[in-house]
Amino acid sequence: MSERKKKKKMLRIILIIAGVLLVLFIALILWLPSFVMTGTRQTLEEAFAWQSDHYDTAFYDTLEKTDYTVNGEDGYALHVELLENPTPSTKYVIISHGYTDNRMGALKYVPLYLDLGFNCIIYDLRGHGENEPTFTTYGVREGEDLNCLIEDTRSRYPDLTELGLHGESLGAATTVAALKYKPQVDFVVADCGFSDIENVLREGYRNAHVPGFLVDLADLGSRIRYHYAIKDMRPIDSLDDNEIPVLFLHGEEDTLILPKNSEDMAARTEGEAEYHTIPGAGHAESVLIDPELYEKYVKEFLNGIETDEA
């Protein structure tokens, strides 16, 4: 084989390898945001079974329930469920669940609010539960959805005299993100939420010894595939001029979303804020590990708000 043919063959091989690497690189860019934003969701049955294994859910079957749907700003239908307090009440709380969970995941907080005299509204965040499959925007569209649910709640229940929000993990971030819209609510309880999803991803990748630049690739892929930037998913920015009282709770042993996220948000809000950690609790475990302390913090917070308003 002549030298010229050898060079042509070598160039062809190099181009093929470069082409394969380019295809793999593009595939990685498009796959990363899918991995980050479309995790495997639980069914209602799976979530309820998990709740029943870890908490007493016998109360659920005794409650009067009403199922309905509420449309988000873009017309996306959210499945909602009202759990009526056995004692007639005009107080309501909307509870938002965490990532890959669904409204059954909110049941762990329902007994606390029933005891406090609230009717409880639980719902499936977009892309979860009975809703149509879609990707998660870590508070961006979810916050808009929650604001629509807040407005619907006030319209649907005209006897309402008090309305609060409670969220866990993604639900907490969603709850904080909704404050951007200045909703007419009386209080917020945000449990183990993130201030911005980028810091959570970078911390998780670092702990897994995965190169941090993959977060940047995921951000690029998210912009291309979903038209949302991971770096813009920052619930903390909704707190700059917030005046609604917020209670931030976090498990001290949470390694998925570090307690500093809640601490930073408590420092950022313009309104009244409390920040407490639950010793020995990992991610989304606070009410399981120490229900008495959890209840104490929530009740004292709500009592403090009522005292301030008196």
Model-derived segments and spans:
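Short beta-strand/loop motif that positions the catalytic acidic residue
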Residues: 241-243, 248-250, 254
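Alpha/beta-hydrolase active-site loop
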Residues: 136-157
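Conserved alpha/beta-hydrolase
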Residues: 113-132
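Catalytic histidine-centered segment of alpha/beta-hydrolase-like enzymes
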Residues: 281-292
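Short alpha-helix in the alpha/beta-hydrolase fold that links the catalytic acid
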Residues: 109, 244, 258-267
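Hydrolase active-site cap/lid region
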Residues: 42, 177-228
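The serine-hydrolase catalytic nucleophile loop
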Residues: 99-112, 125
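An N-terminal hydrophobic leader/cap segment in hydrolases
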Residues: 14-17, 21-71, 81
